[in-house]
Amino acid sequence: MRESLTYETGLHEECGVFGMFDLEGGDVARDMYYGLSALQHRGQESCGIAVCDTNGPKGVVNCYKGLGLVNEVFHEETLKRLGGNLGVGHVRYSTTGSSTIENTQPLVLKYFKGTLCLAHNGNLVNAFEMRRQLEETGAIFQTTMDSEVIAFHIARERLAAPTAEEAIKRTAAKTRGAYALIISSPRKLIGVRDPFGLRPLCLGKKGNVWIMASESCAITSVGGEFIRDIEPGEIVTITRDGVFSDKSLQQEKRAHCVFEYIYFARLDSHIDDVSVYEARLRGGAALAHSFPADADLVAGVPDSDLTAAMGYAKASGIPYEIIFHKNSYVGRTFIKPTQEERENSVRIKLNILEPAVRGKRIVLVDDSIVRGTTMKNLIRMLKKAGAKEVHVRVSSPPFLFPCYFGTDVPSNKQLIASSHSVEEICREIGADSLGYMPVEDLEEMAGGLPLCTACFTGNYPMDVPDGEIKDALE
């Protein structure tokens, strides 16, 4: 007997990293605050800022971290105490490790060669093996994060390596998985991107201040100018002597995370020379060509896929309408601990504009269906408000496999599409029809980039372990 398709929502963001180096010695904490706020969509569990003064005593770091949103953790007095011209920041949603204060970032490590501050976005597939190797030689860990494993290996390699960059390269040679790192040593700001380019990282500048960030929107939000993406397999080092690039980690094969363009990245960002806004418009248009519908209006589910809905409407010639009022002060549905509370949260967060839907045939566009709870409730609400038909269109293919690279996609048994047909899902959520984005349309949607589509196809760009790798570090 099949289990019920009434699942909780389950697609979560990853993390965001941000770094600044003011070459003229000005404090960066305030701009760090705004930069992290611009990346808040990438993680809402915790955040932190670590700063140091490159003109002061070497190795002295001021760090403040906490659980919650950026504007909940940091206040005016907190920022005033964070004096320094070199900073690393982080916003977190946990993909490995529990949601505790110990697991907040940036990590600050004091070791034989100095001090290392590290912020990490991504997930390692061999973190458990790397951690065990360190523990067998006496290492003691303070967190359950794979990020600490990276930091420890860099610190250990630095004992013999002539520079921090060389220690990073030696660590990368042992590492499998996704990572975008921003690291500060006492006189350097260093950005590192994994050879596949799974996680984004970019470079910008504001006057004499160099900036690194997960997304370009964080650079422009602090008044900076986006310069370029840090390339897959590239290490960029910023010092008072200039900007230096090392591409010795690069490889031919690349696999950019497709979900940056479907969901994760902010609409005003450019990632690897591709506009996120334009990518979502193309995705909606492709969906309209593959799965047309006889309907009176097209609408998106706030805020996840309004742009794809606009693309669908433009390509189909069906008018785009707003049919939901969103209460912006209600937390995201996955935060609630019980199924009943999750369902109630959907009703409170989104209310139907009845005059817009009464008697109408609706194309409803969303970015994903992972477990199905939210969509089932929305369709029920729409039909109760008088909608005649609801045709669901999803701007991603069905989720069939877990992600090992930093996206919190549940295990196979929780993914409804892995054990139920499209027709079964359609019946269970109460839709009049259901269409998913074809896998073959994804690359064109993302501007022709080589993509990681493993969560849809099971074709991982590297060897991955059996089971949930995140369980090994929780």
Where are these regions (language model features)?
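Secondary-structure transition/capping motifs at alpha-helix termini
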Residues: 139, 160-161, 292-296, 314-321, ...
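Flexible loop/turn segments at secondary-structure boundaries
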Residues: 95-96, 126, 198-199, 219-221, ...
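Conserved short alpha-helical segments that host acidic/polar catalytic motifs at enzyme active sites
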Residues: 1-232, 237-295, 301, 389, ...
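Extended, hydrophobic alpha-helical segments in both membrane/secreted and soluble proteins
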Residues: 298, 305-312, 316, 320, ...
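PRPP-dependent phosphoribosyltransferase catalytic core
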Residues: 172, 187-188, 223-229, 249, ...
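A conserved beta-strand->alpha-helix junction
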Residues: 143, 148-151, 320-331, 428-446
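Short, glycine/charge-rich flexible loops or terminal/linker lids adjacent to PRPP-binding catalytic cores
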Residues: 317-362, 373, 400-406, 410
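Mobile, glycine- and charge-enriched loop segments
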Residues: 351-365, 369-370, 394, 464-465, ...
